[in-house]
């Protein structure tokens, strides 16, 4: 009865479940000895062949025997299909054993499925792998689970896999996984302290780089919006500040400013008076010094340097102005170009150490007094320069005539200080370092000069 039940089980495994049944798998599944499992498979094949239903079965055999190869005898064990069984037998000198290894419905192309079937069943029975085996050793004692090297390697591989999985987790919002999960895996003692310090340092550096990137983007956006706001002069100063923030474009902007300053303004109707050559040379020498000082200046002093350079550019513009002789309608305002007084009035402004006392035009005709001694108020056309930034980002200076009202006494006050405070030509050739210190000292000198002019004018009126 027992053998009949076993055969029914084998038939169910092969036909119904379409499994590959090996003698090892059958021994562990049914709990029988391996030799008994081999006999059960052999009987099942013989019974199916007698019933003429064995044509659907494919059988593999385990063959062992001695083989003479290269003049040496050796013992050979092979798993072969039924159609190659006779060929393997003929090669063996002595056949030791032949028994059924596996039964399956499909024909196998290689031994891969057989290996997988035995591997799975042996892995699930590692502690009792020799329980149903034909080879046993009474002196063999199994090791404890903690002492076996295979279990240690298995545990270490699990720990490494867990640590790699945690390391590969992506951080969310700049924060890593909770510290409680990593605490159990970090080594204790000094090594654990060093690892924790390194982790905190990396987090701090990541936090520091993010605000720096935000500051750079905000500065660039603010610099891009600055030139479009304010008046013409505010656009000019905003342009200079934006050039300092953009370090890569600093040299190019400086070259553009030099070119625009050196270009003389275009005259349409009136003749011009040429500036002295010494003044041009000094401006050309001072401009390369400014470019070098811009590159060497630190970031902390950019605001102060921008104010000073803005004043210096104003001085250069005042030096470069070409004053046109205004046309007056009245006969009293006629001006002669060949008179020496006009050349004195058209002389260049003082050096950048002391800025000019007044940006008003200096080519005004001498006052004309009536016979009765009364002053005459009149309107006259004055040539003024206007600066603005064009579409290409270059600074353009244009001169436009504007009408102003003035008296004869005011003209006298403006003419006399201009001729009295005429600077020597050698004073223009000063180093650019003195031009840096000029605006602060020049402010005090300007105030004193204005006070002196007002006092002298007061006495002259009386």
UniProtKB/Swiss-Prot annotation:
Residues 156-174, 451-462 have a biased composition (Polar residues). One of its GO terms (biological process) is DNA repair. It comes from the Eukaryota. The modification Phosphoserine is found at residues 306, 403, 405, 409, 454. Its main location: cytoplasm. The modification Phosphothreonine is found at residue 407. Disruption phenotype: In a conditional knockdown, embryonic lethal when homozygous. Induction of the knockdown in adult animals results in a generalized accumulation of DNA damage and ultimately death of all mice within 15 weeks after the beginning of the treatment. Heterozygous animals are born at sub-Mendelian ratios, and, of those born, some are dwarfs, present hydrocephaly and have a reduced lifespan. In cells, Pold3 deficiency leads to replication stress and cell death. Residues 144-186, 200-230, 254-384, 403-462 are annotated as: Disordered. Ubiquitinated, but not targeted to the proteasome. Sumoylated. Sumoylation by SUMO3 may be predominant. Residues 218-230, 416-427 have a biased composition (Low complexity). Keywords: Acetylation, Cytoplasm, DNA damage, DNA excision, DNA repair, DNA replication, Isopeptide bond, Nucleus, Phosphoprotein, Ubl conjugation. It is found in: Cytoplasm; Nucleus. There is a cross-link at residues 256, 259, 429 (Glycyl lysine isopeptide (Lys-Gly) (interchain with G-Cter in SUMO2)). Residues 204-215, 284-305, 428-437 have a biased composition (Basic and acidic residues). There is a cross-link at residues 256, 429 (Glycyl lysine isopeptide (Lys-Gly) (interchain with G-Cter in SUMO)). It holds the Pfam family CDC27. Residues 330-344 have a biased composition (Acidic residues). GO terms for cellular component: cytoplasm; delta DNA polymerase complex. A motif (PIP-box) lies at residues 452-459. Residues 348-368 have a biased composition (Pro residues). Component of both the DNA polymerase delta and DNA polymerase zeta complexes. The tetrameric DNA polymerase delta complex (Pol-delta4), which consists of POLD1/p125, POLD2/p50, POLD3/p66/p68 and POLD4/p12, with POLD1 bearing DNA polymerase and 3' to 5' proofreading exonuclease activities. Within this complex, directly interacts with POLD2. Following stress caused by DNA damaging agents or by replication stress, POLD4 is degraded and Pol-delta4 is converted into a trimeric form of the complex (Pol-delta3), which consists of POLD1, POLD2 and POLD3. Accessory component of both the DNA polymerase delta complex and the DNA polymerase zeta complex. As a component of the trimeric and tetrameric DNA polymerase delta complexes (Pol-delta3 and Pol-delta4, respectively), plays a role in high fidelity genome replication, including in lagging strand synthesis, and repair. Required for optimal Pol-delta activity. Stabilizes the Pol-delta complex and plays a major role in Pol-delta stimulation by PCNA. Pol-delta3 and Pol-delta4 are characterized by the absence or the presence of POLD4. They exhibit differences in catalytic activity. This is DNA polymerase delta subunit 3. It comes from Mus musculus. The gene is Pold3.
